[in-house]
Design a protein with these regions (language model features):
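Short, hinge-like loop/turn segments at secondary-structure boundaries
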Residues: 26-30, 129, 152
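FAD-binding core/adjacent interface of flavoenzyme oxidoreductases
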Residues: 45-151
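Conserved active-site region of classical short-chain dehydrogenase/reductase
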Residues: 120, 162-165
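Residue-level marker of alpha-helix boundaries and capping positions
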Residues: 34-35, 113, 154
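Cofactor-binding loop segments of dinucleotide-utilizing enzymes, especially the Rossmann-like FAD-
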Residues: 12-14, 115, 156
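Glycine/Thr-rich phosphate-binding loops of Rossmann-like dinucleotide-binding domains
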Residues: 19, 99-100, 162-163
Length: 170
């Protein structure tokens, strides 16, 4: 926006939120930040009203034509496909958490925390009847019906350390 105040800018985000405090996610899981909405920094309307940026959440780029300078977008809620033209294209596809190929890595009670919905899912799992809400009653291996007492945090970066700190509070 600083380079050209009149440029048409389109920002596409696959998830439901455009801008959130990812360092606050562990504190939301731990209860220090009780309201999920407190994690949100800016909304679609904030980008539109303050920065004149057309921001589309729950939308995914499913095709790029460099020859025609167009992108094909899919609305993840409605399934509708649209085509938009561009002069300059900036790719910022984000990241995905690394899930090591360990036996049981996809069982209930194993979480990645990178987005607001990830933190919501973990917090809900911690606060509800784990056996029924998580689907653990469908497994024949180790099952828990009591509140979890132990946790393992894989990753010693800021988020991992803050997650360990906040799980102690639970």
């Amino acid at each position: 926006r600083r380079l050209d105040e009149s440029a048409e800018i389109l920002m596409v985000e696959r998830g439901p939120y455009v801008s959130f405090a990812n360092c606050g996610l562990p504190y939301h899981v731990g209860g220090s930040i009780p309201k999920e909405s407190s994690l949100l920094v800016a909304t679609e309307s904030t980008f539109r009203e303050q920065f004149a940026i057309d921001c589309r959440t729950q939308c995914e780029v499913v095709g790029v034509s460099t020859e025609h300078k167009t992108i094909e977008l899919k609305n993840l809620v409605t399934g509708e496909l649209t085509t938009e033209r561009y002069d300059k294209l900036v790719l910022s596809p984000g990241a995905a958490p690394i899930r090591p190929p360990l036996p049981g890595i996809d069982l209930p009670g194993i979480f990645s925390v990178r987005t607001v919905p990830d933190a919501r899912h973990m917090r809900q799992w911690l606060e509800r009847d784990q056996a029924k809400q998580s689907g653990m009653d469908q497994y024949t291996g180790f099952q828990t019906v009591t509140r979890p007492q132990r946790a393992v945090v894989v990753g010693g970066g800021f988020i991992g350390l803050e997650m360990a700190e906040n799980l102690i509070k639970r």
